[in-house]
Amino acid sequence: MNLSKLKFGSTIGIIGGGQLGKMMAQSAQQMGYKVIVLDPNSSCPCQYVANEFINAAYDDQIALDRLGALSDVITYEFENISANQLQALASKYNIPQGYQAIQLLQDRLTEKQTLQDSGSNIAPFLQLTDYDDLVKAVDSIGYPFIVKTRFGGYDGKGQVLVKDATHLDEARQLIQAQECVAEQYLNLSKEVSLTVTIGTNNQITYFPLQENEHQNQILFKTIVPARVQDNKEQEARNEVNKIIKAIHFIGTFTVEFFIDQQNQLYVNEIAPRPHNSGHYSIEACEYSQFDTHIKAITGQQLPQQVTLLKPAIMMNLLGRDLDLLEDQFAEHPEWHVHIYGKNERKFNRKMGHLTVLTNDINETEQKLLKQFEGR
């Protein structure tokens, strides 16, 4: 795909008004574009920065057509919009990202099958339609393994870790609700991710490899550059190069990886949009993941590479972290704090993030962990 550059003053439509949509909008407006956002939540974070806001459900075809008619280009902040509706929208309006990636990645089974067919290194998996398949997973994959719903689920939702036979009943209940996928549980040494942007002229921009730590299946912190062997970044790029031959991408997306105790790299999953682990790039790189996303979908030239200006640590701020830390923000000028503007503070809800640039990652990490003690 090779589209002409979208002129400044043109309008970018965003489906989804959460924090990702908000940060996309801010990058777009900085480049001189207007932004119109569609979201069912009348007080979503993006509502406060959008030039125009459409308060409607994601499956409201009249509202989607209005968004399309008012926009010169359309993007989305998340992958849970109906692929069929996105396909219908793409047939009438300019959606450089298309619908194919969403169609593949909404279903964990087709995601795994596509990755397998691409030659990517992934953990063994099995489709689960009933309890008999669960028994087969015990035989073919062996304990421990993870059962995940095929559709939906994020931040650890829709998953059961099956360590032994005592967890089979919990997994059976998940399968009764919807079809699932079982995948081998890996003994991990690290989790990393690679954020990538692809332009409409097939340019590829890689961000630095990101080291991630999760707590209760929610991203806790990201450290850049990742503290791994030097060859791991190139290995990750090689895996991404396999993936982009199999899946159509325009804009920013992120591939999450596991590194096991034998130092083997495995593709875990793909997010076809800007990702939580890339938020550090707002301060730590000359272009953020949102900047390159907007450049890509508007037909602009992408940088050949994104340079890390300084090592960085990004910490997510959940509702409980704001309860603990909000009085500390004014005392730490080195903290770049982003509060998303969600109207309801919940214990485990992502309410914001903070980024610290540092020449000593280990020392800064320890200082931050002390601040987050008791969370």
UniProtKB/Swiss-Prot annotation:
Keyword Nucleotide-binding: yes
Alphabetical list of SUPFAM superfamilies matching this protein: Glutathione synthetase ATP-binding domain-like, PreATP-grasp domain, Rudiment single hybrid motif
One annotated Gene Ontology cellular component of this protein: cytosol
Signal peptide start and end residues: none
Keyword tRNA processing: no
Keyword entries, A-Z: ATP-binding, Ligase, Nucleotide-binding, Purine biosynthesis
Pathway: Purine metabolism; IMP biosynthesis via de novo pathway; 5-amino-1-(5-phospho-D-ribosyl)imidazole-4-carboxylate from 5-amino-1-(5-phospho-D-ribosyl)imidazole (N5-CAIR route): step 1/2
InterPro entries reported in the protein's UniProt record: ATP-grasp, ATP-grasp_carboxylate-amine, ATP_grasp_subdomain_1, PreATP-grasp_dom_sf, PurK, PurK_C, PurT/PurK_preATP-grasp, Rudment_hybrid_motif
Reactions catalysed according to its record: 5-amino-1-(5-phospho-beta-D-ribosyl)imidazole + hydrogencarbonate + ATP = 5-carboxyamino-1-(5-phospho-D-ribosyl)imidazole + ADP + phosphate + 2 H(+)
UniProt-recorded Gene Ontology molecular function terms: 5-(carboxyamino)imidazole ribonucleotide synthase activity; ATP binding; metal ion binding; phosphoribosylaminoimidazole carboxylase activity
Pfam families: ATP-grasp (PF02222), PurK_C (PF17769), RS_preATP-grasp-like (PF22660)
Residue span(s) of domain ATP-grasp: 112-298
Entries under NCBIfam families matching the protein: PRK06019.1-1 (NF004675), PRK06019.1-2 (NF004676), PRK06019.1-5 (NF004679), purK (TIGR01161)
Assembly description: Homodimer.
Family: Belongs to the PurK/PurT family.
Protein name from the UniProt record: N5-carboxyaminoimidazole ribonucleotide synthase
Species in which this protein is naturally found: Staphylococcus saprophyticus subsp. saprophyticus (strain ATCC 15305 / DSM 20229 / NCIMB 8711 / NCTC 7292 / S-41)
